[in-house]
């Protein structure tokens, strides 16, 4: 149900949930349009596409909600651009590499597996590059283009709160927050984007979440958290992320700046095999999986 105007509402009658089953990932290859990077499907059957060029992205959900589906669907969709060097990805995984460590080859110089000095230095490096690019583009380009001679930069942060909220060193925490705010507020034109993944949407955890132009609410614990992620009044306009069942990881409500109503969508289901395929595709390597030979007893003996 949506309020179209005062005194007028619009109703959708759904007879079956088109997002109830996992969505298999498309084949690797093809071209990439950074203005429409498909990572899944909406409940109306349309592609769920992120406008990576000019956007900043925040995905919030409880453990098991499917944040990894958003991450790996995006990286698979970007595979041709990663392979050609058009897009360069950096990563910080303070959980010791439990997520990004599945495919470290995809990340420039490898992911950082902590929330300490190395993570902060990477954030500050990208913040400086954001400012430097803006200076180089000034008077020449209005913004990043595929032909500008520099790669589009994507920074993946999993888990974001460990970097800007749970860091116990006050100076590192302040430096990390300052650098990240520079990237998210100034990265649009220079071609620098952030995908932040987090479980806790409270304002004290992410005080500058308004700088993320696309906010993705996967399964949440409480109704109040929906408006924390998507904005005031979005839950009343249908964005019931707190009602997403545990059986549908990857289902989310998505709110983009400039659009009044949220969209319900589901990210592709990316398996471990799909991630291995992605690494081989991007790095130009190949691998064949062979069945382990069966061992048979010989001359009446027993197999070891």
Pin down the residues of each PLM region:
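Periplasmic polypeptide-binding modules associated with outer-membrane biogenesis and secretion
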Residues: 143-144
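P-loop NTPase catalytic phosphate-binding loop
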Residues: 3-10, 20-140, 150-230, 234-238, ...
């Amino acid at each position: 149900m949506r309020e179209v105007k005062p005194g007028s509402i619009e109703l959708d009658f759904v007879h079956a949930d088109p997002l109830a089953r996992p969505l298999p990932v498309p084949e690797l290859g093809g071209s990439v349009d950074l203005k429409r990077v498909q990572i899944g499907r909406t409940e109306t059957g349309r592609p769920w596409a992120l406008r990576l060029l000019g956007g900043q992205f925040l995905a919030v959900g409880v453990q098991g909600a499917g944040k990894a589906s958003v991450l790996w669907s995006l990286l698979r969709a970007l595979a041709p651009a990663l392979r050609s060097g058009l897009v360069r990805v950096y990563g910080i995984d303070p959980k010791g590499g439990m997520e990004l460590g599945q495919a470290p080859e995809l990340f420039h110089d490898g992911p950082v597996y902590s929330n300490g000095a190395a993570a902060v230095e990477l954030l500050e490096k990208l913040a400086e590059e954001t400012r430097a690019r803006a200076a180089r583009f000034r008077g020449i380009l209005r913004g990043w283009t595929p032909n500008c001679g520099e790669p589009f930069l994507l920074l993946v942060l999993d888990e974001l709160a460990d970097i800007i909220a749970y860091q116990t060193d006050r100076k590192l925490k302040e430096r990390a927050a300052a650098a990240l705010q520079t990237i998210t507020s100034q990265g649009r034109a220079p071609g620098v984007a952030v995908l932040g993944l987090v479980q806790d949407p409270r304002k004290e955890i992410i005080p500058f979440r308004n700088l993320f132009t696309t906010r993705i609410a996967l399964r949440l614990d409480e109704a109040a958290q929906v408006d924390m992620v998507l904005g005031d009044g979005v839950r009343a306009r249908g964005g019931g992320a707190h009602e997403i069942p545990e059986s549908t990881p990857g289902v989310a409500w998505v709110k983009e700046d400039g659009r009044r109503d949220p969209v319900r969508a589901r990210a592709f289901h990316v398996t471990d095999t799909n991630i291995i395929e992605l690494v081989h595709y991007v790095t130009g390597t190949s691998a064949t999986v062979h069945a382990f030979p069966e061992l048979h007893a010989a001359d009446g003996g027993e197999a070891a």
